[in-house]
Structures are given as structure tokens and as C-alpha cells.
Amino acid sequence: MQQQQEANQTGAALHMGDVIKLENHLEQSEASETPVERRRRSGGRSAERTRRSPASSRYLNLINTTAPSTVLSEDALEAVHQASLTILEEIGMDIVLPEARERMKAAGAEVTPGTDRVRFDRGLILDMLASVPPAFTMHARNPLRNVEIGGNNLVFAQVASAPFVTDRDTGRRAGNQDDFRKLVKLAQSYDVIHTTGGYPVEPVDIHASIRHLDCLSDLVTLTDKVFHVYSLGRQRNLDGIEIARIGRGIPMEQMEREPSLFTIINTSSPLRLDGPMLQGIIEMSARGQVVVVTPFTLAGAMAPVTIAGAVVQQNAEALAGIAFTQMVRRGAPVMYGGFTSNVDMKTGAPAFGTPEYMKAVIAGGQLARKYNVPYRTSNTNASNTLDAQAAYESAFSLWALTQGGGNFVMHSAGWSEGGLTASFEKFILDVDMLQMVAEYLTPLDVSPDALGLEAVRAVGPGGHFFGTPHTLARYETAFYSPILSDWRNFETWTEAGRPTTYDHANRVFKERLNAYEKPPLDPAIKDELEAFVARRKEEGGVPTDF
């Protein structure tokens, strides 16, 4: 009864003329929208913002102005640092490439004859860290898509390296070229996805010897963003560097000054760097391209069961890889990658988006800042479908990497099933969440006009703000309009068939693919790219055994 009286009082307080005025504004704005935009707005459904050119997008070059969180005191941080150096000095790493061991020995590392074992004096590691650039720019073929790495910059890359792909209509299936291209097109369609991050799904219908040629040329033609090359043999790196150079239409000398390509270097935990990864560091760092050294340390499996122990091992492995980039070329751009989580101790299955993962992400950020090296993290979850688990594990991951000072976020959109599957619907859910993060990071406007004193003065006690000039001038852009949230009341939502987030995401990804526009590409560059790919295919591509 009391609630009903309050509702009546609220309704009586509204000045209907002002409400009508606001509705008229809505009708006028809807008259200029496309039918699809009007349909998204109807019934209280909030939807995507109008498409804008990259130059006008608010989602490029995100800056994280929040103070980073910490889980380690200064003493604890120093203890982790010293323990990591002790591992490198006393236990060492297995370096499974003779050329890499020779380079390390020449730089001052201790190589045990007849073995792969290399030990690093702590002074050597610290000397190598001193030449790592704290920030740099990755250059896209469209300069508006350049991304700033390091400092307070926050860059999102889409899902990468999934062997399977899924959508609600077709279900889970092996990766293929058609789905690869669709996911790449989706990455191009959203400005909050700043780079592609490798193959969003592995197209196994393309032979492995030439797969990189088809995929990398697609990344040049279907997007105008920075992209990734896999370190799976020296020649793949060289082909990737040349394709990136052709895509930008620049000489190699400029390419070496302006990094345009990145590679993920995963250690083979515990304490091992394999041949293809080391070759990748040599080829990429020697040519000034970006290396992202990322140990994959699951506590209780490939690392100690304690998160502190796993982070110590992560740090030791990362420092060894980072130091090697500087042995190859002083000042080579590199990132500190952290990917420590835990396993389900009942099954051994990896777990993501957990409290332990969050602690490891924030601790990794503290270490990266200690060394003044840009920090790579990931948006993770272990859910097998688009459900509450997928959302809350990703939300915790995003919270940790944002609060932990992450600079470069792999698997930002589309990661499902612990990385085994790229999901079209999860991609849309993640994009929505990434845009929310971006909006949260937008500085709060506290200008005199934003403080709204004149609006409060005009309305006074007991009034409302629906029809004030202050509201009418801002209502379209005052708040973030989610892609997927359904804000209709229960009755209207029921009449519409009770659609779920899964339903909306399925619809939206199809709409975005239908609206995809290929970015312009100079015909001369296209011809040079096609000629290079054709020549390399004729030469047989690359060997498929390592």
C-alpha cells in the first residue's frame, strides 16, 4: 500500500508537458535513424552506438587513470623479485637452441657444456632490463589504428589460437578459413578491439605449410589494425615481417624503426624455452618487432601450488626471455606477459577468472611496473558456453587486469572453454564489457556545466529533470547504451518471447557481419602482397616439422 502511494506521488510529480517534450525529441531522433537502429531502441532495448570513423571513436587509445591495486607489500614484492633471480642464478633455464645458448654465453650467461642448461647472474638480468623501452608504438597500416603500449595505455586484442569455433546455430566445430575470416571481420568492426591477436581460430582446412601466408594476408586485407605472427619456425617470422612491411607500404629500414608486428613467446614451463620460441625472439627482436614473453604457469601443475611460488616462477621465466631480447638487440620492444592461474585439484583442469588468477594478475602488474616494462594480461574464463560463468569469470579477469595496470590484453573478446573455443556470441558479450570498461575509464566531467547547478536551480525541490534543457541537450549521450542488456519490463520482455543474452548476441554478431566494410587498401600494395604470397606458396611455404 505504501509502495503504491509512493508510486502515485511520483507520477503526480511529473510534469506531463516536459515528458511529452522529451518524447518528441526521441521521435525526432528516431526519424533520422535506420530501421535497424529504431528496432534496437524500441521497447527500452539499449543498443550499439552509431558507427563512427576511427578518427572520431572514443574507444581508441584508452588510458587507465585509476590507481593500480596491489597484493604485495614492498617487502613482499622484493622477496618475489629476489627469489626469481635466485632461480635464474642457481637453477637456470633449459634453452633448447644452440644459437640462443651461444648468444647468451657471449652476453655473460653461464652455459653448462653438453646440456641445454643456462644460468644467469642477477647482475646480467638487471643490466638487460635497463635497456627495455618502457613504452613504444605499434604501427598499423592505418595510422589511426596505431596503438600505444606501456605507461597507462590499455590495448585490447581479440581471442587467439582456439582450435575450435562455435555459435548457437551450428555448434562447436573445428577451426576453418570461413570462420577465421568472419572473426577477423568482427575484430575490424569494433574500435574497442585495437588489434587482432593471432588467428582467432586455427583454420585447419588450410595446409600448415602455407596457412600463415593465407591468414596473414587476410589480416592485411580484411583489417587495417596491428596483427600477430606465430613463432613456429624462423621462416614464418620472416614471412610475417615481410607481409606486415608490404601492408604498410614502407621500406624495411622504417619497419625496424616502427614496430608493426608482435609475437607471443610462451615458455614451456617449468623453466624451459623451446627452439621455435627462441628463433622467434631472434628474428623479431633483431628487426625491432615486438616480443611478448608470456610464461603459462598453472599453480599445482607446471608451477608450485602456491600462487606466490607460481608467480616467482612466472617472473623468473619472463625475465629470462625479456633479457634474451636485449641480448639480441638492445632496446628491442618487449612486453612482460603474465598468465598464472590455478587448476582444479580434483581433475587437473585449468581454471580461469578465479580469485587466484586475480591475485596473480595484480602481482604480475606490480612486477612489470618494478621493471618498467609494459605488461600483457588476458581476459579469461573456463565456461563451455555463454552463461553466467562465462560472464562473471570474464568480469573478474577484466577487473583484475584493469586494476592491476595491464597494458596489453590478449583474448579480450571471444575466448571460451578455457581457450579451446572461439565463440561468436562470447565475442559480442566481451565487446560490450570492454566498452563498459572503456566508459568507466573515461574521466568524470566536473565542468561547471556538468555540475548542473543551473538545472537544479530551475527544477527546485520536488520537481524532475526530464524536460529541462540540461537533460534534452544530453539525453542521447549521457549514458552508455549496452549492446546486449535488455531493459524492458517483464511484460514487454515476455511478449517479445523472453529473449536471453545468448539470443541478442547471436543476432548482433550476424548484423555486424552483414554490415562489415572492408578497409581501403592501395591497389599497388594489394598486388605486391598477392605476388609475395603466390611466390612463397610456389616455393612450398614452410616445413611442417620442427
Please identify what each model-predicted range represents:
Residues S57-V132:
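N-terminal alpha-helical transmembrane segments of multi-pass membrane transport
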Residues Q2-Q4, K21-L22, E30, V36, ...:
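Catalytic-core signal marking the mid-to-C-terminal active-site face
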Residues I264-M433:
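Glycine-rich anion/phosphate-binding loop at the beta-strand->alpha-helix junction
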Residues E89, R101, E110, D116-P295, ...:
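Catalytic alpha/beta active-site cores
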Residues S56-I63, E74-L85, E148-D169, Y199, ...:
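N-terminal small/glycine-rich loop or linker at the start of catalytic domains
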Residues Q2-R58, V111-P113, R117-R119, F136-A140, ...:
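Long, compositionally biased, glycine/small-hydrophobic-enriched stretches that function as flexible linkers
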Residues Y59-N64, K105-T112, L298-A299, S341-D344, ...:
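Short acidic (Asp/Glu) and glycine-rich catalytic loops that position anionic groups and cofactors
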